[in-house]
Amino acid sequence: IFLILFFFLFLLVGLSLYAQQNCFISSYVRGNFYNRGRISAESLRASDDLIFLNVRPNKDGSLSFENPRIFENGKGVTSWEELIKSVRADVKGTKTKLRLGAASGEWKAMVADEAARVAFAKNIKKILEKNKLDGIDLDFEWAETEKEYEDYSLAILKMREVLGDKYVFSVSLHPVCYKISKEAIAAVDFISYQCYGPSPVRFPMEKYCSDIQMALAYG
């Protein structure tokens, strides 16, 4: 009996450790929430991956950054560069990765132009190098046509080509927008899927599960 109990205890511990090793928690960090004290240091330290959602692409591939007006009061952080430094101090001693997040802006026009895609990827790499960040997350909402999916996929491939394997590269997709090319899927380290829920009011369990399976079936 002792041997049986020991075996099941060993199995339980092993499964628990496996689950912990294969669980990866990413969190977006916005300067306005941080300055208002709405993000605790404990929450930051509990994350494996923190994404500073601070940059927007312009149509030519240049970058625009979060409006300085949001950095007011609170912790005294006055720019997104200071936000990175402050959060880096908050998570000192952990293995938390710090990454840049790109969203919104003129992304559809940018990904539609080959020269702009190249410029965007190179500009992102410069920011990562300058601020000693661990990678980039793209949260472009949303591609709506076959051409937009194709252009977005090409931008993803170009980003990986420019960054190489040194940086962590992810994209955030959604149940209404997930059909990037198989080559683009293979080019990223992982994909976050904005499948919210389950919630009995807006996102019932059946819808939550079907949305997940839909993306998995796609590949």
Give each language-model segment a name:
Residues 4-14:
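Bacterial N-terminal signal peptides
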Residues 15-19:
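Sec/Tat signal peptide C-region and signal peptidase I cleavage site
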Residues 20-123, 198-214:
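Glycan-recognition patch characteristic of GH18 chitinases/ENGases
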Residues 50-54, 128-144:
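Short acidic catalytic loops
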Residues 114-136, 158, 180-184:
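An active-site-proximal structural segment forming one wall of the substrate-binding cleft
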